[in-house]
Regions:
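Ferredoxin-reductase
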Residues: 1-80
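FNR/FR-type flavoprotein reductase catalytic core
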Residues: 71-152
């Protein structure tokens, strides 16, 4: 079982969870995703890794409750657990394999909105950790739906 350390509503109908998943946290890179399953009856749901902390062994996911399984997920609290939490899956962002010095010469701009901001955050964080400047343009239908603004 994969224990939920934190669960909160970031904005109207957008939720964030920090999940204990040490193996996933050790191996993930920006652009990858996990597949979660809350319980035996739940569907397997692919979700972008919004953040990871290798030292703490945690993964952060952000989602909107659209289907039955994500609607159940939004009711999970800190201390609850996911039945399955598989990852990291998918290809990392292209720049993870590029030469750092070459990346420093480029102008990198991300455009994101609403829950689609979640995949941008780990990429910006990775670039910043490697001394690479990048910009982000974040929008949403209303100011209340802008997420991760402080983090970025």
């Amino acid at each position: 079982m994969y224990k939920i350390q934190e669960a909160e509503m970031l904005a109207n109908n957008i939720y964030r969870m920090v999940v204990e998943a040490p193996r996933v946290a050790q191996h993930c890179l920006p652009g990858q995703f996990v597949i979660v399953k809350a319980d035996e009856e739940g569907e397997r749901i692919p979700l972008t890794i919004c953040d990871y902390d290798r030292e703490a062994g945690t993964i952060t996911i952000v989602f909107m409750p659209i289907g039955e399984s994500t609607k159940k997920m939004k009711d999970l609290k800190a201390g609850d657990a996911f039945m399955d939490f598989v990852g990291p899956l998918g290809q990392p962002s292209e720049f993870c394999s590029e030469d750092i010095e070459e990346l420093k010469k480029k102008r990198i701009v991300f455009v994101a909105g609403g829950v689609g901001t979640a995949p941008v955050y780990p990429q910006l964080k990775w670039l910043h950790e490697h001394g690479i400047t990048a910009d982000a343009i974040v929008g949403a239908k209303t100011k209340d739906l802008v997420i991760l603004e402080k983090e970025m």
